């Protein structure tokens, strides 16, 4: 029983050390990135628009941001207009999304929920490429209450 517990402790320490070393070896692990200015958007039904800041906290990465609204099934909704739907955000800059509802009347006795999607595609300097490269785009999804 004692040997089993020692092996469990060793395995846990090995996993923690491996994670710590791998995270430190990744060059952009702590470089920052794209953040949305809220965890949810509340769009009051009588208002013309709602706003959401998008922040690039990276000191050297530029991103292409694509945004859209989807319904509960994940299908893109044409009832919303987001400006700008596609834009470039430079390092240490901020942009504001404007979300406008242009669809039919929604129920007034309860909130309707939609999902705001924001995809961040990192730019790449082709002159610095040598060999294979893996580029990962991240997508954030937050709730949009109307």
Identify the residue ranges that each predicted region occupies.
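Intrinsically disordered, low-complexity Pro/Gly/Ser/Thr-rich segments with frequent PxxP/GP/PP motifs
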Residues: 78-106
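Bacterial N-terminal signal peptides that target proteins for export
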Residues: 2-16
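Short beta-strand and strand-turn-strand segments in soluble, beta-rich domains
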Residues: 64-66, 70-85
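Short acidic/proline- and small/hydrophobic-mixed sequence motifs that coincide with surface turns
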Residues: 60-65, 109
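Asparagine-centered strand-capping/turn motif at beta-strand->loop junctions
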Residues: 54-58
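Terminal connector regions
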Residues: 104-146
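Beta-sheet-dominated interaction scaffolds and their linkers
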Residues: 30-53
């Amino acid at each position: 029983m004692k040997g089993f517990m020692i092996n469990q402790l060793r395995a846990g320490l090995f996993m923690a050390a491996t994670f710590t070393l791998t995270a430190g070896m990744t060059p952009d692990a702590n470089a920052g990135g794209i953040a949305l200015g809220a965890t949810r958007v509340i769009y009051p039904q009588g208002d013309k628009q709602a706003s959401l800041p998008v922040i690039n906290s990276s000191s050297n990465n530029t991103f292409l941001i694509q945004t859209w609204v989807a319904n509960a099934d994940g299908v893109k909704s044409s009832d919303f207009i987001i400006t700008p739907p596609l834009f470039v955000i430079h390092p240490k800059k901020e942009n504001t999304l404007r979300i406008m509802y242009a669809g039919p009347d929604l129920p007034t006795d309860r909130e309707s929920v939609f999902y705001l999607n924001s995809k961040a595609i990192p730019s790449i300097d082709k002159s610095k490429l040598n060999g294979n490269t893996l580029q990962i785009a991240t997508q954030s999804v937050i709730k949009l209450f109307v």
